[in-house]
């Protein structure tokens, strides 16, 4: 529909039926000298529920005086706010509050059991903001007026009560792509369903939901990662998102743009699923941008929004009468949904006239029949108490701590086994690098040159383990952060259960990789023979692999994206590398950097491996073949040259173990802080 196609001809307070020809008449000047009948909405729109019976499992959801503000981002606004706060503290100047945008303007509405309510409007009308505020899911920086009331069956509710009874399907589908649809639902059942249910009962519920949402054919298909791993189609992913929420059989379902990115066929199948849920007595609310005529017929009620205000609430049939009465009859060659959205849209280049028209429509609706009935009902229904203690959630989380840990551990272990880049490629990479280093330093002898080469090969052990494991951890962990943020905000599991489950599931891989590397490179290079020497070296290399893994966790938890983590990692690792004793003698470290050397795992591991290699090398074992070169007479001389002592080997093990614990605790704290900032 073009710009002229949006014109609604209302002149002299009389409604004029708008035909397709008049809408395309370029000579008309729309909205000029127009007025709106102040009583046009008296008899249009409905508030009556389809069923009078209401229980805790059959909910009427209503919101009253929903007033929402959002921060306006301005260039340099953070710096300006800081300057204003400093002036307020030290200069006794009044702090100027940041500008705010009025997102929702005293909106009220109601959705009943057994009906599908579609929230419609143009982009920026406030549809998603309405849903987020209704479901207590508003993002950081959004402020909701204290006068706002959200009710279930006439009882005011808080975020905890709403979470217990409402399922919220967001626009973006976030999954672990290496799982199948069935595995994903089993995990969701483990953390969502009540703790008194057995595992068998949860699996039976998963089977029932798979059948109800027609996921049987794809239940054993990988979910996949768009653009990387082929998996479920867009419609199947959306139905899987519904299935995740439907496991607990919630009486209220809120969906944000469920048809976004889908073709007309897939969109129709998704909305049909929601329609079936509403026919089972569920209260279903969804936002939709541009529904087809077939989709529009599935809606029981529509709520039209414009400029953050409610412009209409009622059935699609009543909407036809509503807009006809104000002189905006829908032409026969347009779908009603498109026409209503266009009528309530702000036309580029004609913002003043458009906003004036929208304001008049919304103002008149606010004093009409539906708004008056809602006002009266809210005054009658609001009660001081909620659902009562007997109906409140007994636990903050549905699953126990152990069940959360078990579920996360199971899912993380499946991800490790199924992720090709995490297992196959890493094992192949480790084997190739170990063979390459072994062949380059093949069969080193105890000579002057051999001593230098062995020391270099040992340091390569450390650098390879560090960069291979830290960067692998950064890549893997950050990709799950969006899923983690959403699931923790939905109170599916705690931060500590996720962190423990994730790290323990990946631990076997970080034990196999150093063993494989050491088993190949150690004998090829010809390092100190003996079972005790081999296992001492293996223990040190394994500790290095896990220190670097822990450091990778810390970087990934502290950074907001994979690209940022990959950019931050190398510059932070380099200082630790310099204090390893290979480039800079440990006795030459400046006093002001001494503290940093104690945080370097390169220092502890390099010292430990060199002690393991040279501590028991007696005088005469090193062959001196070059007379013009200083030749170390024994292993003790080599260690003294590097400022290492054989007695420090136990402290090297302790230092590496403490770094593992310290980095992981720091990573957990960073992860917890990130999760709390999102709440």
UniProtKB/Swiss-Prot annotation:
The keyword Protease does not apply. InterPro entries: AAA+_ATPase, ABC2_TM, ABC_transporter-like_ATP-bd, ABC_transporter-like_CS, ABCG_dom, ABCG_transporters, P-loop_NTPase, Pigment_permease/Abcg. The gene is W. It is found in: Membrane. The chain crosses the membrane at residues 427-445, 457-477, 507-525, 534-555, 568-586, 651-670. PANTHER family: ABC TRANSPORTER G FAMILY MEMBER 28, PROTEIN WHITE. It comes from the Eukaryota. It is a multi-pass membrane protein. This is Protein white. Residues 84-332 form the ABC transporter domain. Residues 1-34 are annotated as: Disordered. It comes from Ceratitis capitata (Mediterranean fruit fly).
């Amino acid at each position: 529909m073009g710009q002229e196609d949006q014109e609604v001809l209302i002149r002299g307070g009389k409604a004029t039926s708008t035909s397709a020809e008049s809408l395309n008449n370029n000579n008309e000047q729309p909205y000029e000298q127009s007025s709106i009948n102040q009583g046009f909405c008296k008899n249009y729109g409905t508030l009556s529920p389809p069923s009078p019976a209401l229980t805790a499992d059959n909910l009427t959801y209503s919101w009253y005086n929903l007033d929402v503000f959002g921060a306006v981002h301005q260039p340099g606004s953070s710096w300006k706010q800081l300057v204003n706060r400093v002036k307020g503290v030290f200069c006794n100047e009044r702090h100027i509050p940041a500008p705010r945008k009025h997102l929702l303007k005293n909106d009220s509405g109601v959705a009943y059991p057994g009906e599908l309510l579609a929230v419609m409007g143009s982009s920026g009308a406030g549809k998603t903001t309405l849903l987020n505020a209704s479901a207590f899911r508003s993002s950081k920086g959004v402020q909701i007026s204290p006068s706002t009331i959200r009710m279930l069956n006439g009882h005011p509710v808080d975020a905890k009560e709403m979470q217990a009874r409402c399922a919220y399907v967001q626009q973006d589908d976030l999954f672990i792509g290496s799982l199948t649809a069935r595995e994903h639902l089993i995990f969701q059942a483990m953390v969502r369903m009540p703790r008194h249910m057995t595992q068998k009962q949860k699996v039976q519920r998963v089977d029932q939901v798979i059948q109800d949402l027609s996921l049987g054919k794809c239940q054993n298909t990988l979910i996949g990662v768009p653009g990387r791993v082929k998996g479920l189609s867009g419609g199947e992913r959306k139905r899987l998102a519904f299935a995740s929420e439907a496991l607990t059989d919630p009486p209220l379902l809120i969906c944000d743009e469920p048809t976004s990115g889908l073709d007309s066929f897939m969109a129709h199948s998704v909305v049909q699923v929601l329609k079936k849920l509403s026919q089972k007595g569920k209260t279903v609310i969804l936002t939709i941008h541009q529904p087809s005529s077939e989709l529009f017929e599935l809606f029981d009620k529509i709520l039209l929004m414009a400029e953050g205000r409610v412009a209409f609430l009622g059935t699609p049939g009543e909407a036809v009468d509503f807009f006809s009465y104000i002189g905006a009859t829908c032409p026969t060659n347009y779908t009603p949904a498109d026409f209503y959205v266009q009528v309530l849209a702000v036309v580029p280049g004609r913002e003043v006239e458009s906003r004036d028209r929208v304001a008049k429509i919304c103002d008149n609706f606010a004093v009409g029949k539906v708004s008056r009935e809602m006002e009266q009902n809210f005054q009658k229904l609001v009660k001081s108490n909620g659902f009562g203690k007997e109906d409140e959630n007994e636990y903050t989380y549905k699953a126990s701590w152990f069940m959360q840990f078990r579920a996360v551990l199971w899912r993380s272990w499946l991800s490790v086994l199924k992720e090709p880049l995490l297992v196959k490629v890493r094992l192949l990479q480790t084997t190739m690098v170990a063979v390459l280093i072994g062949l380059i330093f093949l069969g080193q002898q105890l000579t002057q040159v051999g001593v230098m080469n062995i020391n270099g090969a040992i340091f390569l052990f450390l650098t390879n383990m560090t960069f291979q494991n830290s960067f692998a951890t950064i890549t893997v962990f950050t990709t799950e952060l969006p899923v983690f943020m959403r699931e923790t905000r939905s109170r599916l599991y705690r931060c500590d259960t996720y962190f423990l489950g994730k790290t323990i599931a990946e631990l076997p891989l970080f034990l196999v990789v150093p063993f494989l590397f050491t088993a190949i490179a150690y004998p090829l290079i010809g390092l100190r023979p003996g079972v005790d020497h081999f296992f001492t070296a293996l223990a040190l290399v394994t500790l290095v692999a896990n220190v670097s893994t822990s450091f990778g966790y810390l970087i990934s938890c502290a950074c907001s994206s994979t690209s940022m983590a990959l950019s931050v990692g190398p510059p932070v690792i380099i200082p630790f590398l310099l204090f390893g004793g290979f480039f800079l003698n440990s006795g030459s470290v400046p006093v002001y950097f001494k503290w940093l050397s104690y945080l370097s795992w390169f220092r502890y591991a390099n010292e430990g491996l060199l002690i393991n290699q040279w501590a028991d090398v007696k005088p005469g074992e090193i062959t001196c073949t070059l007379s013009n070169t200083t030749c170390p007479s024994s292993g003790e001389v080599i260690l003294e040259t590097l400022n290492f002592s054989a007695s420090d080997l136990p402290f090297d093990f302790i230092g590496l173990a403490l770094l593992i614990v310290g980095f992981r605790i720091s990573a957990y704290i960073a992860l917890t802080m990130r999760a709390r900032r999102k709440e």
